Amino acid sequence: MSDPPFAVKGIDHIVLRVRALPRALVFYRDVLGCSVERQQPELGLTQLRAGRSLIDLVTLDGPLGRSPATPGPGGPNLDHFCLGLAPFREADLSAWLAAYGVEVIAPATRYGAEGEGRSFYIEDPDGNRIELKGARGDGPTQGREL
């Protein structure tokens, strides 16, 4: 079998359906530091820049949010997505998130696209789980978990 005629460069974008766009914008823009790149209110679409990727926020009452695609049995099919952060200073990040009322869940060392590094999970206002991850060497390494 030969190699495919392409190479995956990374995640281009993810699309999240949100109940309240203003609340989602506060979270992704103000808490996580993403910038608004493009808005198409007629579609219920706001696109946020997250490093080299985009996070598309789609309102449930807009044309895109009402699309016929539905989750499989038992609920949504997305477990979580991961945002790589630099620098990853765990205490500073935890304090920043706590100031916004965001709970840090299950801090540990995990493997990702750039190798092992410290990470933890948070949830956005719509319950989407997000992993925030540092590169190897950022933060403590105890509690190794893959």
PLM feature spans:
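N-terminal beta-strand motif that seeds the catalytic metal site of vicinal oxygen chelate
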Residues: 1-22, 78-81, 85, 136-146
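Residue-level marker for the onset of beta-strands and adjacent loop->beta junctions
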Residues: 12, 43-44, 79, 118
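Core segments of cupin and vicinal oxygen chelate
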Residues: 16-62
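Vicinal oxygen chelate
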Residues: 18-22, 76-77, 81-126
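Active-site beta-strand termini and strand-to-loop segments that position acidic
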Residues: 48-52, 122-125, 135
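Helix-adjacent hinge/juxtasegments
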Residues: 60, 66-84
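A short acidic/small-residue loop/turn micro-motif
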Residues: 63, 112, 136-139
